UniProtKB/Swiss-Prot annotation:
<dbReference type="InterPro" id="IPR000702">
    <property type="entry name" value="Ribosomal_uL6-like"/>
</dbReference>
<dbReference type="GO" id="GO:0022625">
    <property type="term" value="C:cytosolic large ribosomal subunit"/>
</dbReference>
<keyword id="KW-0699">rRNA-binding</keyword>
<keyword id="KW-0694">RNA-binding</keyword>
<dbReference type="InterPro" id="IPR002358">
    <property type="entry name" value="Ribosomal_uL6_CS"/>
</dbReference>
<comment type="similarity">
    <text>Belongs to the universal ribosomal protein uL6 family.</text>
</comment>
<dbReference type="InterPro" id="IPR019906">
    <property type="entry name" value="Ribosomal_uL6_bac-type"/>
</dbReference>
<dbReference type="GO" id="GO:0002181">
    <property type="term" value="P:cytoplasmic translation"/>
</dbReference>
<comment type="subunit">
    <text>Part of the 50S ribosomal subunit.</text>
</comment>
<dbReference type="Pfam" id="PF00347">
    <property type="entry name" value="Ribosomal_L6"/>
</dbReference>
<keyword id="KW-0689">Ribosomal protein</keyword>
<dbReference type="GO" id="GO:0019843">
    <property type="term" value="F:rRNA binding"/>
</dbReference>
<dbReference type="GO" id="GO:0003735">
    <property type="term" value="F:structural constituent of ribosome"/>
</dbReference>
<protein>
    <recommendedName>
        <fullName>Large ribosomal subunit protein uL6</fullName>
    </recommendedName>
</protein>
<dbReference type="InterPro" id="IPR036789">
    <property type="entry name" value="Ribosomal_uL6-like_a/b-dom_sf"/>
</dbReference>
<comment type="function">
    <text>This protein binds to the 23S rRNA, and is important in its secondary structure. It is located near the subunit interface in the base of the L7/L12 stalk, and near the tRNA binding site of the peptidyltransferase center.</text>
</comment>
<dbReference type="InterPro" id="IPR020040">
    <property type="entry name" value="Ribosomal_uL6_a/b-dom"/>
</dbReference>
Length: 178
C-alpha cells in the first residue's frame, strides 16, 4: 500500500495557494496553474504546508489520495521551477530548427514536420539534433514531447529517430544472408 498521500507538501518561497471548494490555484514566479480535484480528498493549507486527507477507505479513494498529492506537488514544482523534456535526433540528415514560434523537423519524410508552440509550452533547439520542451504543466510538457517523438519514433535496427535523452532503444539484429 502506498503512503505517498500522507506526505506533506512544503510550499517554497514565492508560491501561494488559493482554494475555492475543489478548485485549487497555485501561483508562483513562473506562472499560475488551476486544477479541480475530487471532493473525496480534503486539501488543508496551513502556513506553508499542504496536507491531504481522504474521506473514505475504499480502494478508489485510496488511489485518489496519492494521485491528488502527486498532482498538487507537480503544480507547486511547475510554478516554482518548471519542467523540461530533452529529445535528441539520430539519423543522417535529421535536423530540428526554430522558425519564429514554430519547431520545424526534417526527419526523413518528403516534407518538413511543423509544431506550433502551445500556450505555456516553449521549444528550444540548442543544436540541430536536440530539442528542449519546457513549461510549467508537467502533463502538457510530457504530452507535447511524446507527440514530437511519435513523428519518428526510434526504430530497432539502426536506432534512427527521435528519442528522449537517456532513453535506451533495444536493438535487433538484421536478417542474415544465405
Amino acid at each position: 500500500m502506498s503512503r505517498i498521500g500522507y506526505k506533506v507538501v512544503n510550499l517554497p518561497e514565492g508560491v501561494e495557494v488559493k482554494q475555492d471548494g475543489n478548485v485549487v490555484t497555485v501561483k508562483g514566479p513562473k506562472g499560475e496553474l488551476t486544477r479541480e480535484f475530487s471532493d473525496k480528498i480534503t486539501i488543508k493549507v496551513e502556513g506553508n504546508e499542504v496536507s491531504f486527507e481522504r474521506s473514505a477507505e475504499d480502494n478508489k479513494t485510496k488511489a485518489l489520495h496519492g494521485t491528488t498529492r502527486s498532482n498538487f506537488h507537480n503544480m507547486v514544482v511547475g510554478v516554482s521551477e518548471g519542467f523540461k523534456k530533452e529529445l535528441e535526433l539520430r539519423g543522417v540528415g535529421y535536423r530540428a530548427q526554430m522558425k519564429g514560434k514554430t519547431l520545424v523537423l526534417n526527419v526523413g519524410y518528403s516534407h518538413p514536420v511543423e509544431f506550433e508552440e502551445e500556450e505555456g509550452i516553449t521549444f528550444e533547439t540548442p543544436s540541430a539534433t536536440s530539442i528542449i520542451v519546457s513549461g510549467i504543466n508537467k502533463e502538457e510538457v510530457g504530452d507535447c514531447a511524446a507527440r514530437i517523438r511519435a513523428t519518428r519514433a526510434p526504430e530497432p535496427y539502426k536506432g534512427k529517430g527521435i528519442r528522449y535523452v537517456g532513453e535506451y532503444v533495444r536493438r535487433k539484429e538484421g536478417k542474415t544472408g544465405k
